[in-house]
């Protein structure tokens, strides 16, 4: 039995990650594909993260970074097991979000990556670009929904993409019409599922 693929969607807030994940789930109807999003707000760490994001509680940046990281590690074994059982996971945000947001607040990229080192490695990371319209919509109730901060996050994403580090990035332009974007992403995901080989890798090892 071939293993499943770990396919991650990344991008700024309101870039359409969840929409595209749901498009994939609807357009590839199969019992071998599951959706997972981060942060998972139902866990102990997730509830603390939710309180922070919704401004109910405050923590220093180092604690916040570790909470987000721990939230992903809570699901590392689950992800590994699902992939080995032939289940493809469509993941809405992953370690790259953690690093981009942490470094946008001034954390060391090397240190931030070290916290995530060893997590199951994605077979494909789809980065959804945001046009100026989408970026300017980033004003909301949650703590990171701020235009200036999102611009900083974008620069950190660009650094990771440029560095590469054996990560298969696929950048989707914000210029595409929605129906074209949907079809393009579906084809990219199908190809990734059909071509995945070898054991599950470890991220940043």
Curated annotation (Swiss-Prot):
At the top level, the lineage of the source is Viruses
Which keywords label this protein? ATP-binding, Early protein, Kinase, Nucleotide biosynthesis, Nucleotide-binding, Transferase
GO-annotated biological processes = dTDP biosynthetic process; dTTP biosynthetic process; dUDP biosynthetic process
The pathway to which it is assigned is: Pyrimidine metabolism; dTTP biosynthesis
Q: Name one Pfam family in it.
A: Thymidylate_kin
Residue ranges annotated as coiled coil are none
EC code: 2.7.4.9
* Summary of subunit composition and partner proteins: Homodimer; the dimer arrangement is orthogonal and not antiparallel as in human enzyme.
Q: Spell out the NCBIfam families in the cross-references.
A: DTMP_kinase (TIGR00041)
Q: What is this protein called?
A: Thymidylate kinase
Organism name: Variola virus (isolate Human/India/Ind3/1967) (VARV)
Its gene is OPG178
